[in-house]
């Protein structure tokens, strides 16, 4: 019963559309109707930057923090409760699934990057540092958020197989690959635009 509660909490917290809520409360704008129509930090920044650059940066950062925490906090609580690695990994997948397919948004949602990074940092801190370095470098020089995220994801997956050939207790990289699949799936429109040279930059 405890595990079922943990799973439900992970999905429901993951489903909270942080960026959408913050943009509506403080920016008085519905980001699902503006810009890329995504609920993530990049769209918060892009949309609000047009009218209030300082607020845009603050809300974008706060969106990232909230999206990370909604994935990490349930894992921290569950670990204190003695949850096994298999339960924790299942919670991680459900948190990202909640963000990508939010029950509060008719099973629409964000791209899962910040929430995915948060839950993976809980298990794979070294790999996340590597991924963040890649994300920063690609983002800084190419200024394309989606490309930076996808390159960081590839770096994380590759480094996880090198640093952790077998994950503790579960002995499989399946949860990482499922999270990666969710993120890539939600990035399909971005990938299409990247291939056609039409993806927007974050200036």
Curated annotation (Swiss-Prot):
Catalyzes the transfer of an acyl group from acyl-phosphate (acyl-PO(4)) to glycerol-3-phosphate (G3P) to form lysophosphatidic acid (LPA). This enzyme utilizes acyl-phosphate as fatty acyl donor, but not acyl-CoA or acyl-ACP. Belongs to the PlsY family. The keyword Cell membrane applies. The lineage of its organism: Bacteria, Pseudomonadati, Campylobacterota, Epsilonproteobacteria, Campylobacterales. Pfam families: G3P_acyltransf (PF02660). Pathway: Lipid metabolism; phospholipid metabolism. GO terms for biological process: phospholipid biosynthetic process. It is a multi-pass membrane protein. Keywords: Cell inner membrane, Cell membrane, Lipid biosynthesis, Lipid metabolism, Membrane, Phospholipid biosynthesis, Phospholipid metabolism, Transferase, Transmembrane, Transmembrane helix. Probably interacts with PlsX. SMART domains: G3P_acyltransf. Coiled coil: none annotated. It catalyses: an acyl phosphate + sn-glycerol 3-phosphate = a 1-acyl-sn-glycero-3-phosphate + phosphate. The keyword Hydrolase does not apply. It is found in: Cell inner membrane. GO terms for molecular function: acyl-phosphate glycerol-3-phosphate acyltransferase activity. The chain crosses the membrane at residues 3-23, 61-81, 87-107, 118-138, 144-164, 172-192. Its EC number is 2.3.1.275. HAMAP family: PlsY (MF_01043). Disulfide bonds: none annotated. This is Glycerol-3-phosphate acyltransferase. The gene is plsY. One of its GO terms (cellular component) is plasma membrane. InterPro entries: G3P_acylTferase_PlsY.
């Amino acid at each position: 019963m405890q595990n079922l509660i943990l799973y439900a909490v992970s999905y429901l917290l993951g489903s909270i559309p942080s960026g959408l809520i913050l943009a509506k409360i403080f920016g008085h704008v519905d980001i699902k109707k503006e810009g890329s129509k995504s609920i993530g930090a990049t769209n918060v920044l892009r949309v609000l930057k047009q009218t209030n650059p300082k607020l845009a940066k603050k809300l974008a950062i706060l969106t990232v923090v909230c999206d990370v925490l909604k994935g990490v906090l349930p894992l921290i609580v569950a670990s204190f409760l003695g949850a096994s690695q298999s339960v924790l990994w299942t919670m991680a997948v459900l948190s990202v699934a909640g963000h990508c397919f939010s029950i509060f948004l008719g099973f629409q949602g964000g791209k899962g990057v910040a929430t995915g990074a948060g839950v993976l940092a809980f298990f794979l801190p070294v790999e996340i540092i590597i991924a963040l370095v890649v994300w920063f470098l690609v983002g800084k020089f190419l200024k394309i958020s989606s490309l930076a995220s996808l390159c960081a994801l590839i770096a994380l997956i590759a480094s996880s197989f090198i640093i952790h050939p077998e994950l503790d207790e579960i002995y499989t990289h399946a949860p990482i690959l499922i999270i990666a699949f969710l993120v890539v799936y939600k990035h399909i429109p971005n990938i299409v635009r990247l291939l056609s040279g039409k993806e927007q930059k974050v200036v």
